[in-house]
Amino acid sequence: MAKGGNKLMKLKSVLKKLNSFNTKPNQPPAQTNHSRSSAVSAFPSEDLQTVYVGRTRRTYHVSSDVVSHPLFQQLAAVDGGCGSEDGSISVSCEVVLFEHLLWMLENADADESRPESVYELVEFYAC
């Protein structure tokens, strides 16, 4: 049980860090385009790629900007999920965490990126 509690404490710590630099004063919340079976990024590119997430292989259609993001690349590399024959990507990550990742990428400000937390996030997101 101590191992699970330790992971939970680390996850809370990482989420606090993310929330501290993702909150921007005097800005309305960003609108996202999430649906139950797919999540389309708010990035400008219209080139969508299929991503299968988790044990249930839930289908998401995300922009190439999301797929090319370093955090997404790290997560896919850890899971060995990049590049199948049909161009789809498999990520063995919990669906809720993947949706949080999409939210973070859609709401992140490029000037506020924190590379030191990328590795912590990948460690928690990978199953």
Curated annotation (Swiss-Prot):
BP terms from Gene Ontology: ethylene-activated signaling pathway; response to auxin
PANTHER family the UniProt entry points to: EXPRESSED PROTEIN, SMALL AUXIN-UP RNA-RELATED
Coiled coil: none
GO CC, one annotated term: cytoplasm
Entry comment describing in which tissues the protein is expressed: Expressed in cotyledons, hypocotyls and roots of young seedlings. Expressed in emerging lateral root, leaves, flowers, stamens and filaments.
Recorded family membership: Belongs to the ARG7 family.
A Pfam family the protein falls into: Auxin_inducible
Record protein name field: Auxin-responsive protein SAUR76
Topological type in the membrane: Peripheral membrane protein
UniProt-annotated stretches for the region Disordered: 20-40
Function statement: May be involved in the regulation of ethylene receptor signaling. Promotes cell expansion and plant growth. Involved in the regulation of cell elongation.
Record note on disruption phenotype: No visible phenotype under normal growth conditions.
UniProt-annotated location(s): Nucleus; Cytoplasm; Cell membrane
UniProt miscellaneous comment: Plants over-expressing SAUR76 display increased root growth and reduced number of cells in leaves leading to reduced leaf area. Plants silencing SAUR76 exhibit increased sensitivity to ethylene, while plants over-expressing SAUR76 display reduced ethylene sensitivity. Plants over-expressing SAUR76 exhibit increased rosette diameters.
Induction trigger: Induced by ethylene in roots. Induced by auxin in roots. Down-regulated by abscisic acid (ABA) and paclobutrazol.
First and last residue of the signal peptide: none
Gene name linked to the record: SAUR76
UniProt organism field: Arabidopsis thaliana
Record keywords: Cell membrane, Cytoplasm, Developmental protein, Ethylene signaling pathway, Growth regulation, Membrane, Nucleus
